[in-house]
Amino acid sequence: MNVTIEGQVFDVQSGVSCRDALKGALSGKKFKNVVACRCNGTPLDLTATVPADTTTIEPVFADSPEGIELIRHSAAHIMAEAVQKLFPGVKVTIGPAIDSGFYYDFDYERPFSVDDLEAIEAEMQKIVAAAHPFTRTEMTKDEAVALFEGMGEAYKVEIVRDIPADTVSVYRSGDFVDLCRGPHIPDTSFVKAFKLLSVAGAYWRGDEKNRMLSRVYGTAFADPKALKDHLHQIEEAKRRDHRKLGQQLDLFAFHEDVAPGMVYWHPKGMLLRTILEDFLRKEHLKRGYELVQGPQLLRREVWEKSGHYDNYRENMYFTVIDDNAYGVKPMNCVSHMLIYKSHLRSYRDLPRRMFELGVVHRHEKSGVLHGLLRVRQFTQDDAHILCRPDQLEAEIIGVIALVRDLMGLFGFDYRIVISTRPEKSIGSDEDWDRATNALIGAVATAGLSHTINEGDGAFYGPKIDIKVTDAIGREWQLSTIQVDFTLPDRFDLVYIGQDGERHRPVMVHRAILGSLERFIGVLTEHFAGAFPTWIVPVQARLLTVTDAQNDFAMGARDQLVAAGLRVEADTRNEKLGYKVREAQLEKIPYILVVGDKEVEAGGVNVRLRNGENLGLKTLAEVAEMIRADCQEPFKRGGMSYSFS
């Protein structure tokens, strides 16, 4: 049969393995880097027979994203085998590849600790050196149950029984047997660079009612340099951890015994957040948005109407008032629909752009809560645009322009992913084509590139995801632009067209920064706590050498505050070096030292948080420096900063 491999057509004999088919098509050096393949898009082991209907075979290389994922998944199996050898009686559960590595959950008589990792790694090295092949066996569910019952693996038995299919696949490597869909790398020697990172507790199946397991995290790469770079990134991420910096900078705290997953904003953190919120409101007003706000509690019936009750209620909080059931809002869209519906709209009234810094609550399991990055109460910079179909592309262009300006303001590089129609969806082909083409056209008009994520749109419409890269190369998803065919129909939203008839508007959900809590967490780590001068809670701090300069320092503070700047004066009876060090740890941009010479000259000695000394400056010069520093990032996006 004729099969296309890397753009060339080859005659592949029936019954041959994927390995042999690729070996005949690729150079020796290239073939050695292949870890699996895709036949007509289906991932397969290299030992698998090429299916009879195959027209295309795509090699999966070790250093590709898919190849690295396979290496990590196989490394999880290797780790589980090592743990079983070192700790007799341990029970294995699940061990997937994840974004930056892999993990495996174990049930043992005691929790694993970081002290165990070195021994596990050493045993893994032996297994890697042995080059045990990964072999796949398919069997019935009953056979798999009997297999794992005989091994005493109760967790695997439970998983098998929950699988709806009649047959399952099992992989063997060395002495280890695991239930797995596959595919896997050819043998254990392909895991050339790995490292075990940490241990944690995890409930079986994420349910707090189940047994607590020991989760061991690790990572693996195709080559040692990539692993070294990743480990450096991990160390840098620890230094930038927003939870540590939040405490160091006195921005926020959590009290898990009182309100798990909910933030206590301290004065400086609240000031930073307020500066951000005020900026967002002003920027949206400039761009034609209207400020709105909906209630926190809505009757259950409205959540049933919107579809949230059927599809999202496990993530919602409910209460009863006067015998009526209410849901605490997990999203802002329903209220915005009702605000739109409060008036009969004309085609001349569209588009309507409604913006809300809306507080929402979502029930997240305690095991996934993580500082500001995963919380139960958060604020979204949420907007909903209702427009005519002919206005859709222009509205998306406007949203992309806002994304571009805000990401540029904060110094984030980003990429755009467009997700298209999934198998299960609502709406006509015409609606989907028009919406998808509007997204693609808007991105093209903005002069930006994009990738397509086929079939990953929501059931109610296609979407754009904006993925930003931070200062140490980590990727975060922040912005989402989503076309929705469902809610306007469910809430019977209409406008009167030019023909005098009722028409259904198109709806766009969009959030630019997403959760403000999460964004501030990302921002803290991106800047390692050294926030840009325009948003930092304290822009400058005056430090006195002795009490003799206190009056001058307080007067200077008042003068700078009157100029619209955020300035403190530290007049404590402490050594100057101590006060300077404290200001540097708090990452205050401008440290203004006041001694007798400065008082006599009527100025201050200016030091930057990076240690650079700018010498004696007048207060007017200091104010101008801070103003220019604030304006600089705004100039990049053609925006301006207000000191009011």
Curated annotation (Swiss-Prot):
Supply the alphabetized keyword list. Answer: Aminoacyl-tRNA synthetase, ATP-binding, Cytoplasm, Ligase, Metal-binding, Nucleotide-binding, Protein biosynthesis, RNA-binding, tRNA-binding, Zinc
Q: Does the keyword rRNA-binding apply?
A: no
* Annotated Zn(2+) binding sites: 333, 384, 509
Top-level taxonomic group: Bacteria
| Broadest EC class assigned to this enzyme | ligase
| Matches recorded under Pfam families | HGTP_anticodon, tRNA-synt_2b, tRNA_SAD
Q: What is its EC number?
A: 6.1.1.3
Q: In Gene Ontology terms, what is one molecular function of this protein?
A: metal ion binding
> What residue stretches are annotated with the TGS domain?
1-61
Cofactor detail note:
Binds 1 zinc ion per subunit.
User: What GO cellular component entries does it have?
Assistant: cytosol
Q: What InterPro entries does the database record attribute to this sequence?
A: aa-tRNA-synt_IIb (IPR002314), aa-tRNA-synth_II (IPR006195), aa-tRNA-synth_II/BPL/LPL (IPR045864), Anticodon-bd (IPR004154), Anticodon-bd_dom_sf (IPR036621), TGS (IPR004095), Thr-tRNA-ligase_IIa (IPR002320), Thr/Ala-tRNA-synth_IIc_edit (IPR018163)
* Cofactor list: Zn(2+)
| Family annotation (Gene3D superfamilies) | 3.30.54.20, Anticodon-binding domain (3.40.50.800), Bira Bifunctional Protein, Domain 2 (3.30.930.10), Threonyl-trna Synthetase, Chain A, domain 2 (3.30.980.10)
Catalytic: annotated segments: 241-532
Q: What is known about what this protein does?
A: Catalyzes the attachment of threonine to tRNA(Thr) in a two-step reaction: L-threonine is first activated by ATP to form Thr-AMP and then transferred to the acceptor end of tRNA(Thr). Also edits incorrectly charged L-seryl-tRNA(Thr).
Q: What protein name does the entry list?
A: Threonine--tRNA ligase
Species this chain originates from: Nitratidesulfovibrio vulgaris (strain DSM 19637 / Miyazaki F) (Desulfovibrio vulgaris)
- Organism ancestry: Bacteria, Pseudomonadati, Thermodesulfobacteriota, Desulfovibrionia, Desulfovibrionales
